[in-house]
A protein has these predicted regions:
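Short, well-ordered amphipathic alpha-helical segments that serve as non-catalytic structural scaffolds
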Residues: 3-6, 36-45, 82-85, 165-166
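Acidic (Asp/Glu)-rich catalytic clusters
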Residues: 4-18, 45-50, 112-115, 136-142
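A short, structured active-site edge motif that brings together acidic residues
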Residues: 17-31, 55-61, 123-126
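N-terminal binding-site loop/beta-alpha segment at the start of enzyme catalytic domains
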Residues: 1-21, 38, 152-155, 247-249
Length: 249
């Protein structure tokens, strides 16, 4: 996500120590061979100017290569091989923990049955219009921590900002609809990573620990689930390891 220079600046300034911040990076889809994973991690560390990551994730279960002529070219590398490379990274001390992103239940079960080190985290899309309850519950049952990306939706692709339930709760608690959406997942025991570089938004996003939604309010938000996925990566839909099902009618 090209934040290496920002990380370098803040650490070089002395305002924060390395141990004061949590830094996650991901192994991209064109580095899924076991021998490539270590090199990809080292490149990330070099770009960030770091000696280790707090968390390193397999970005997607499906691998591919970028063909200059034909574009995306599906790779037949199994994510089980990729995970062996992730275990190598962990053993080498380049990442304090390793995990996955966008893995479904079947893929996690297969990974658990064939790994030496279980993933610590599964990062996937979770927001009030996609509560992903089944996957969240499965991860919790396996002691896999859930991190939610797009926890307040994505750009103009959702109507979360106008949802009556979120708007009503925002008035009650004197918060924004986005803060209500973030608080919803926090109370589910889910970490959230809203994407912004705006300072005011950063402050707003962290200002969600001075109130608590009631049980009925949590249920009301859960009930607005539309199974509305906003990140689909359509270019890889034909890959055998594509993790998402077609939306229900």
């Amino acid at each position: 996500y090209s934040y290496g220079q920002a990380v370098n600046r803040i650490l070089d300034s002395g305002k924060l120590k390395r141990e004061d911040i949590w830094i996650t990076s991901k192994c991209w889809n064109d580095s899924h061979e076991r021998s490539q994973v270590m090199s990809a991690c080292k490149r990330s560390l070099e770009n960030l100017g770091l000696e280790y990551l707090d968390l390193y994730l397999v970005h997607w279960p499906m691998g591919y290569s970028n063909d200059p002529e034909s574009g995306l070219k599906i790779s037949d590398v199994d994510y089980l091989e990729t995970w062996k490379g992730m275990e190598d990274v962990f053993r080498a001390g380049l990442a304090k923990s390793i995990g996955v992103s966008n893995f479904n239940i079947d893929q996690l079960e297969r990974l658990h049955a064939n790994c030496n080190i279980k993933p610590a985290v599964n990062q996937f899309e979770v927001h009030p219009y996609l509560s992903n309850c089944e996957l969240v519950d499965y991860c919790k049952s396996q002691s896999v921590h859930v991190t939610a990306y797009t926890p307040i939706g994505k750009g103009g692709s959702s109507n979360l900002s106008k949802d009556p339930v979120l708007v009503q709760l925002s008035y009650k608690y004197n918060k924004t609809w986005a803060q209500i959406a973030l608080r919803y997942n926090i109370q589910r025991g889910i970490s959230v990573v809203p994407k912004t570089s705006n300072k005011d938004r950063l402050v707003e996003n962290i200002s969600i620990f001075d109130f608590e939604l009631t049980g009925p309010e949590m249920d009301a938000i859960r009930d607005i689930d539309r199974e509305q996925r906003m990140v689909t990566f359509d270019a890889t839909k034909n890959h055998p390891f594509y993790p998402f099902e077609e939306p229900k009618d």
